[in-house]
C-alpha cells in the first residue's frame, strides 16, 4: 500500500468518527482470521489436569504451590493443593482420571491476560488478523477489548463470534465501537441522534463504545445523552479525549456524565489544570502536524497541578468516588522518550511484517510516524512527562483505584504481544509490585469488561467455575517480567558460564484449548519470512 493510500484510509477513519464527513463511505478492513486448523491447539478435554504448578491467581494473592488444576471442557472445576514447597508430592491425594495431563512441575500458572486496548491490525499497516491474533496468544493474551473497531462493526462482531466458538485462533473479543461507526444516519449532531445510535449499536450486539474524535460528541449535552443511554443499556464506555475536544470535555467532566474508563492520558492533565484552562500551545501549533501533536504532548503534565497539591487530590478523590478506571497504555508512547530503543527492539527483525515496518517510518501521512526530527530535548521532556504521569497512576492504584493494562500496538514501533509485556514492565517502573501488575493484567481487566453488563467474572482469576483461560510459564514472572516475552530473557548460566535464553510462555490455554506458544510464534515468523521473500521478489 502506498503512503498516499495509507493516509486516505487514516483520514477517512478520523473524519468519519469525528463527524466531519458522513459515514456512508466504504468501510475497509483487513483479512479476517482463517479457520482454526486441525493441528492448531489441543482440546478442549473431558478432564485436563495441570500438575504441580505454582499458582499466581490474579487477585493479588502471593504464589502458592504445588497445586493441581482440573479443567473439564472449558471450565476450571478444581484447584487442589497437593503438597508443600520443596517437599515431595504425595500421589494419593492428587486428582485422578485425567484425559490429558500437563506436567507443570517447577512452572508458574497465571490467568490469561486481558489487553484492554488492542486494535486488530489495520489496512494501513498491512497486518492480517491471523498475524495479530497469534502474536497476542503467544504472549498469553486470551481476551482483548477492541477500542474503535475500525475494521467495521459487522467485521469485528463476526470475529468475536468466531473466537467465542473457537473457530479461529484468537483471544476472546469485546467489541467497543466509535460513535457513528457503521450506521447511515450521519454524524451524531444532537442528543437524540446520540441516543438513537447507542440503541442501534446495542441492537447490533456491541459491548461498548470508545469515544474519540473532534466533532459534536464533545458537546456536553451530546456526551451526556450518549453516556446516559449507554449506561441505561448496560454498555461499556471509554475514551481517547483528543486535544481537539478536550477544551470542552476533560476526563473528570466526562466521568461525571457516566464515562466508565479512559485510555492513554488525554484529558487527565487538563482536568488537573489549576492556573490555566488550555494547554500552553506554541502559537504556530498545528494539530495535523504530528510532530507538534506528540512533541507538545510531552510537555503537558508539567503544566498540571503538582503531585500532592489540593487540585491533584481533589481530582483523584472524585475519580475514585466515581469508580473510574484508568487504562494508561504507557508502552505506546515509550518511543517518545527513547526512540532508538523502540526502533531496535530485538523482536522486530523476526516478527515485524515489512508492511508494518514501512508504516513505522517517519512520514507526515502515517499516524504515529512523527519522527521528522526528534530531538534529545523532546526525549527529556517525555521522560519528565512519564515521571508525573506514572506518579498519578501509581497513587491512584495505591488509593484503591482500578488500573488496567492496554498496549495499543501497531503504531510507533510497538508490536502486538511483545509490547503488551512491555506495558507490564512499565507498570512495575511506575511503582507497582509485580503481583499488582498481574492483577491489573488479569482480574482488573476482566472486571472492567464485566462491570457494565452487571455480570460476575467469567475469567480473569483462577477459580473453580470460571473459564479455563490460563498461561503456563517455565520461569517465575514475578522475579523477572521479561520471561514473558516470546524472545525470553538473557541469563548467564553459572554452571556452564554460557549465556542462555530462558522463559517465554510455554502454553496459552483459552477455553480449555491448549496452544503451544512457541509454535504460534513460529507461525508468525513464517508469515514474516514469506512477506520478506515476496517483497524481495517484487524488487527483482
Language-model regions, residue ranges each:
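C-terminal helical cap
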Residues: 53, 371-374, 380, 386, ...
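Divalent metal-dependent hydrolysis catalytic cores, especially in the metallo-beta-lactamase
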Residues: 132-153, 170-181, 202-216, 235-238, ...
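Metal-associated gating/positioning segment near the N- to mid-region
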Residues: 93-167, 186-192, 246-254, 275-276
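Bacterial N-terminal signal peptides
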Residues: 9-19
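Active-site neighborhoods of metal-dependent hydrolases
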Residues: 200-211, 268-430, 528-531, 536-540
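Active-site gating/metal-coordination segments in enzymes
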Residues: 178-233, 252, 261, 289-306
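C-terminal cap of metal-dependent C-N hydrolases
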Residues: 464-525
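Histidine-rich, glycine-flanked metal-binding segment
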Residues: 30-36, 40-44, 55, 61-110
